[in-house]
Amino acid sequence: YNELFKDYTLNRKANLNVNGGGDIAQYYLSVSHNNDTGLLKVDPLNNFNNNIDIKRSNLRANINIDLTNTTKIAVKFYSLFERYNGPSVSANSIFGSVMQANPANFPKYFAYEDNLGYNHTLFGNKGNGGFPNPYADMVKGYKDRFTNTIFSQVQIEQDLKFITEGLKLRGMASVRTYTMNENSREYTPFYYGMAEVETELGILNYLYRIQEGTEFLNNPSVNNLGTSRFYYEFVTEYN
């Protein structure tokens, strides 16, 4: 566990709320920004960040206006912007690999100072390389995602008491949009094992390559999504 995760992390949060108004108009404004980071360690040979880093910015505004004694307008606006950075595989998969892996089978990687001349991390494994190495899964790539959610609503209420006492007309229209852009990149880990050979000097240990990998990130895997939803409502009330 300690080989993969840091002992602590720092998160930041900022909020600002403003409200006010008078007899004709009232308003409420809320702005917030959160920055949450994860506990995942980053491989020293990587030039990218695989640790979780989530930045969220939120804006909410409500405005109520009494145009006349019988006409009222309410406007609501909400937006959420989120930027996510994290490993190319899900956190659930990483924790699942941690539970399945046997720490006595092999090290997460073999130390660099003992293996000069390599330009990549020497991830540990054994056999044919089919054993889970949670550290390799965690640091082999990253995912970058940006999402944007916007909601707008306008409501108009008209009192028709000048026609008939108790008669009201209300109309409401809203739109919700959601967009998402996601990029994921990763490399294929090099897996190595440790073997023993008996020589005249005794038993020597040497590294052998189990799986060929790559020293570069693959082309981005791009996923885009955009949706819009409209809603209209018109109601006549008579009490």
Positions of PLM-derived features:
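Individual transmembrane alpha-helix segments
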Residues: 138-142
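Small-side-chain secondary-structure face that scaffolds active or pore-lining regions
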Residues: 34-56, 86-88, 93, 145-151, ...
